[in-house]
A protein has these predicted regions:
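Short alpha-helical segments used as structural interaction elements across diverse proteins
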Residues: 3-4, 33, 159
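Bacterial N-terminal signal peptides that target proteins for export
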Residues: 1-10
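Active-site-adjacent, His/Asp/Glu-enriched structural segments that form or flank metal-binding
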Residues: 64-181
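Short, linear, compositionally biased motifs with a strong N-terminal bias
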Residues: 14-15
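Mature N-terminal segment immediately following signal peptide/propeptide cleavage
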Residues: 28-63
Length: 182
């Protein structure tokens, strides 16, 4: 019996060692050679790729390594709430001016302008932006900058968004789950 346990332990050790060695020898994930990448002094990693199609359109994304996993129990939902607040005023686009500007150039909220929060990331996107005028790309990059570091978090907007978040939670959560959580 001792011999059996010893052999099992040795086999487990060898399998574990082989798995560790194998995982360290995995090749890197292939990257698209047309994607330019870099890292800014502030730690932001960027990826830029030129596309010919669709013509005169661009997509903009900012992905932050923050999500619900970083919340304490008394902060539950805060990451999602901040995601919503990005559309309610920033330093360079106060109040509703962010939506108004993007809609004026053909970007529709909820279709081409959206965001999501998951366990470990929050991603904002502005898609299918018609880059037909000078300054549109710069404005979209400024929006990404503001989303990363310059939300206004106006108390009136916070109160308005609180109701939106509550209704979103209510419609996505079944009655039994809501009763369980209260």
């Amino acid at each position: 019996m001792k011999n059996f346990y010893r052999k099992t332990l040795i086999a487990a050790f060898l399998i574990g060692s082989a798995a560790t060695a194998f995982s360290q020898q995995m090749p890197p994930i292939p990257t698209d050679p047309d994607v330019r990448t870099g890292k800014l002094e502030n730690g932001l990693t960027y990826y830029i790729r030129h596309n010919e199609l669709p013509e005169k359109q661009a997509d903009f994304y900012i992905a932050q390594k923050v999500g619900s996993i970083l919340e304490e129990d008394n902060q539950r939902g805060l990451a999602h709430f901040l995601e919503h607040m990005c559309f309610n005023g920033t330093k360079n686009f106060p109040g509703n001016s962010l939506r108004e500007y993007l809609e004026s150039i053909g970007v529709k909220f909820g279709v081409n302008l959206n965001a999501y929060t998951s366990i470990d990331e929050t991603v904002y996107n502005i898609n299918d932006v018609p880059v037909i005028r000078e300054g549109i790309i710069d404005s979209c990059l400024l929006i990404l900058h503001d989303w990363a570091d310059d939300l206004t978090l106006d108390p009136k907007e916070i109160d308005k968004e609180r109701g939106v978040i509550h209704e979103e939670w209510r419609t996505r959560t079944g009655a039994m789950m809501r009763m369980y959580e209260t």
